[in-house]
């Protein structure tokens, strides 16, 4: 019985904390989403450039001996 009470108490506290959650406004959510999309795009471009550069360097090094 004591164990069941602890579980009940836990879920009551979860419910109380859920009421304290402050959700972002539509404007904040849109701005945050845009920041994430731009950041992913920029980091993807950086990875693309680095990958292309490393690929070319390796190709040059492999072709030196030929």
UniProtKB/Swiss-Prot annotation:
Transmembrane segments: 34-54
Keywords, sorted A to Z: Cell inner membrane, Cell membrane, Membrane, Protein transport, Translocation, Transmembrane, Transmembrane helix, Transport
Main location: membrane
InterPro entries associated with the record: SecE_bac, SecE_sf, Translocase_SecE/Sec61-g
Its membrane topology: Single-pass membrane protein
A Pfam family this chain is assigned to: SecE
GO biological process: intracellular protein transmembrane transport; protein secretion; protein targeting; protein transport by the Sec complex
Gene Ontology cellular-component terms listed: plasma membrane
Localization annotation: Cell inner membrane
One Gene Ontology term of the molecular function aspect: protein transmembrane transporter activity
Function, as annotated: Essential subunit of the Sec protein translocation channel SecYEG. Clamps together the 2 halves of SecY. May contact the channel plug during translocation.
Assigned protein family: Belongs to the SecE/SEC61-gamma family.
Subunit and partners: Component of the Sec protein translocase complex. Heterotrimer consisting of SecY, SecE and SecG subunits. The heterotrimers can form oligomers, although 1 heterotrimer is thought to be able to translocate proteins. Interacts with the ribosome. Interacts with SecDF, and other proteins may be involved. Interacts with SecA.
Name by which UniProt lists this protein: Protein translocase subunit SecE
Source organism of this protein record: Rickettsia bellii (strain RML369-C)
